[in-house]
Swiss-Prot record:
Reactions it catalyzes: a fatty acyl-[ACP] + phosphate = an acyl phosphate + holo-[ACP]
The protein's role, per its UniProt record: Catalyzes the reversible formation of acyl-phosphate (acyl-PO(4)) from acyl-[acyl-carrier-protein] (acyl-ACP). This enzyme utilizes acyl-ACP as fatty acyl donor, but not acyl-CoA.
A single BP term in Gene Ontology: fatty acid biosynthetic process
Oxidoreductase listed as a keyword: no
Record keywords, A-Z: Cytoplasm, Lipid biosynthesis, Lipid metabolism, Phospholipid biosynthesis, Phospholipid metabolism, Transferase
Name of the protein in question: Phosphate acyltransferase
Assembly behavior: Homodimer. Probably interacts with PlsY.
Molecular function GO terms recorded: phosphate:acyl-[acyl carrier protein] acyltransferase activity
Enzyme Commission code: 2.3.1.274
Catalytic class of the enzyme: transferase
GO cellular component, one term: cytoplasm
Species, as recorded: Sulfurimonas denitrificans (strain ATCC 33889 / DSM 1251) (Thiomicrospira denitrificans (strain ATCC 33889 / DSM 1251))
Amino acid sequence: MVKIAIDAMGGDFGPKPIIDGCIQALKQKLFIPILVGKKSEILPLLPKRYRDKISIVEADDVVSMHDAATDALKRSESSIYKAIELVKNGEAQGVVSAGHSGATMTLATLRLGRLKGVLRPALVALMPTKSSRRSVILDVGANVDSKAEHLMQFAVMGGCYAEDMFKITTPSIGLLANGEEKSKGNELTKATFKLLEGYKGFKGNVEGSDIFNASCDVIVCDGFVGNLVLKASEGVASTITGLIKEYIRKSPVAITGALLMRKVFVLLKKQMDYAEIGGAPLIGIQGCVIVSHGKSNPKAIKNAIFQAISYVDTGVNGHIIQRLETLKNREN
């Protein structure tokens, strides 16, 4: 049974939504949860009937959002450090944390190490599309500066992820640029294009709109661009949702119409809600680490745990190692 270490202290709202999410996950799937944090704060929030099903690892320190990411390396008593160490020591297969994302990625990369052949790990986001399937975009923040060789590997890792997690036989892969033509892009994307030409599934350059129109399964970019895309998308979704609510409240007719369209709004929310995904996997490292939003509610934590379980069960890491090894042999 898969063991998942959960950083109980990492979220913006304390341990309660994280513990509640863990309990929700236990009700639906078989796994072994390990809550890492201050036992004095966790136990009062943990119903007695779950105390024999959830173990607690004491951690009396918390890396806050105001701390530098590299400070986490010196904080061996912090909840995220101890959660990562559980994976390193083989006591857990995956980590879920809604805490300091920079600290989580730094610890995961330096304490767990990269997979064989991986130059840089990448953070993956699953974006909503007009179809029922989400698009995979990476990197969305693990690397601000990247080389063409890194983006080439992101394409390989993203393809493996899409194959294993979404059962896509040959995922289509696009390189995010300012136009579809081969001549478009900056020096980085042009150099990456040359490396990806001929790679199975590569369809060329794609534009920002292609992230959401389901024309491409995997979109590759550097972490600076990817993070801007992610944050801008969150902002647009939040603004549109707010405007719809505001305009509906202003008109009795609109309120009636909204009631009639309630089912449509529920389906739309399900497709757009980050809590449905749970978090962003950091791929290319030993083990499994899911980086969740600081504002994660119990539903988001539950789905982050589910994502970690699926990641471990499908063997994504082994697939990545094998694919990179095959590419290396072809180059030689």
